[in-house]
Structure formats: C-alpha cells, structure tokens
Amino acid sequence: MSVRTLPLLFLNLGGEMLYVLDQRLRAQNIPGDKARKVLNDIISTMFNRKFMDELFKPQELYSKKALRTVYDRLAHASIMRLNQASMDKLYDLMTMAFKYQVLLCPRPKDVLLVTFNHLDAIKGFVQDSPTVIHQVDETFRQLSEVYGKLSEGEFQLIRQTLLNFFQDLHIRVSTFLKDKVQNSNGRFVLPVSGPVPWGTEVPGVIRVFSVKGKEVKKMKFRHGGDYVAAQKEGSFELYGDRVLKLGTNMYSASRPVETHMSATSKNAASRAQENIVPNPLAKEELNFLARLMGGMEIKKPSGPEPGFRLNLFTTDEEEEHAALSRPEELSYEVISIQATQDQQRNEELARIMGEFEITEQLEQNTSKGDDLLAMMDRL
C-alpha cells in the first residue's frame, strides 16, 4: 500500500463532489450569488494551507467511513445543507466517477493528469476569487513537488492502492449506463479502442531478441481492437493541455444523474459489516480525523444570510425512498470509533469539533456520556 495515495484520493473525490454540487445548484435554480458562495466557501476550505500540509504527510488510507466524514464536513462548509440520502448519493457519485477514471488511466502516472484536470476545473468555479485560485495553485505546486519525482513503479503502487480502496463499490450510475461504459451489474467496461499509452506502440507486433539484445525475429498478430498511437503527452505544467479527458466535468451536459445499488454491491455490503466488527485501526482513524479536521478552517456564516437545502434527487419523495431503501451496511451515518480511554485526545477532538458551525438542530435525546464521534456525526 502506498503512503502517497491520500492527497490524490482526496483531491479527485473533492473535484467530483464540486462537479455534482455545481450541476445540482443550477438544476434547482439556486440564485447565482448563493451558488457562487457555496462553491467558493467549500473550495476555500478544501484548499486551506494547513489542511493541505496535513494531507500531504505520508500516511496510509483509512476506511471509507472516515473519509466520508471529512467530505460531510466539507459539503456543509457553507450555507448549503444536504439530507442524509442526498449526501449518500453525492458520495456514491464521487467514488464511482473517480473509480472509473483510475480504471481507464492509460498509464499509472496519468492519475496525476486526472488530478490536474480536476484542479483546472475547480479554478474555473472560483475565477472571480484570486485568493482562492492562489490556494489551488499552491496545491498544484505541492503535487508537482511530491509526485514529480516518483518512479513508474511508485505510481503503479498508488494505482493499486486506489483500486483496492474502490474494489467493492459497484453502484450503477445513469450517465455511465447511458454511455455504455458500465454494465447492469455495476462493473465498468474497459475499451478495446482509442489511443494507446504515450510512449508505447499500437499492439500487433511481437519482437524476439537474442541474448545480446539484437532483434532476430518479428511476428505480427491480429489484436482485435481499434487502437491508434498517442499524438502527444499531456502537460504536467501549471497551465497546459492535459490531452487526457478523464477528470473533466461529465455533468456539463446538464444530464440528470441517478444511482442504483447493484446486487453485487448489496452482497458485498452485507459481507463487510464494517461497523459491527471491531476495527483495529479505530484509534488511527480517530487520529486521522482529528488531524485532518483540525486543519480545516470552517468559516462561520457572517450576517443573517439564510441557508438552503440542496436535494440531489428529482423530488423529495425520491430522496425519502432512497433513504429507506439503502442497505443499512452502506449507511455512513455513524462511525463506531471508541476513544474513551484517551482523555487528552477526547478533549482535543472536542475542541476541534467545537469550531464547526452547523445550523441544523441537534437531536434532543442525546445523553451527556455520548461518544464524541457519534456526536460528530449528528452535527
């Protein structure tokens, strides 16, 4: 497992989250000033310098539930609120989109180009905010500094780590189904056409070499695909043509996007039972959340500006039905991390959580001894 995977996972999933939110803000006719504020606040929080410095420290990936909690905080960093079902759908769309992009990367190194495509689009969302654009550019420089010197083998390990993270997710997405890049069981279709990876040849030739490295025989074969040579390599500079289209905004065509659980995902979820089996990484996940969320600077709303609720479904009825029909094992509502043994860490986490300003009313049936992590999930 690569300890350099987390920044790429976080930034690409965050980019997909912003694509979905932008599409839904436009679909629900949210006033332009409010929509811009939401995206600006989320991006500003996401690319906070302290947060990025913590994120780029070498560290292993943790559970999907721990990461989901961070995105839940991020999505609520402004005046917008999402119900549980809409947040579930948002996270499903984010994860399946990036899984597709990782699967189709021509070379392991191209996951960096996918990340740059996301950053390029994110800068477009905040083009009127030079300060936030500077934050994104600083993150680009961090990416170039950290990943620019990695070998092909290290990028391959990063790709394998990402695929392991996504391996049990087979959620059907309407856009993928309509484009025939996903089967009805939620698995993606790998293409047998198009450009081959930069620096490689179109398949169809086998060369045999002697022990001295001299070519002694050449054989041709029918590969059955429709491949072409890559015309040029994508740019890894701050500004440039990425060539690769993976990571660009697939919602720009304003198509409604639906998600459905495949039977494979339901079976995998029933086997997983992440919340029931004691997690040996629980303490590490708590540390991870405390460090990551401690670096986030959630801006408290200034003035009496009212918030609004964003629905990722066509109607409220659809949202309610989705909440009821979602398998319990796939619910991210509670992270079962017990941290009662470490009083100092509990106090630090309580201080961190106190900095988050969420306007929704807390449930009244909570007790004083509730676990801090359960309290965090109800904020």
UniProtKB/Swiss-Prot annotation:
Top-level taxon of origin: Eukaryota
Primary subcellular site in the record, as a coarse category: membrane
Entry keywords, A to Z: Cell membrane, Membrane, Transport
InterPro entries membership: OSCP1
Record localization: Basal cell membrane
Record bears the keyword Transport: yes
GO CC terms: basal plasma membrane; cytoplasm
One GO term (biological process): xenobiotic detoxification by transmembrane export across the plasma membrane
GO MF annotations, alphabetized: transmembrane transporter activity
Keyword Nuclease: no
Organs and tissues of expression: Predominantly expressed in testis.
Function: May be involved in drug clearance in the placenta.
Name used for this protein in its record: Protein OSCP1
Source organism per UniProt: Mus musculus (Mouse)
Gene: Oscp1
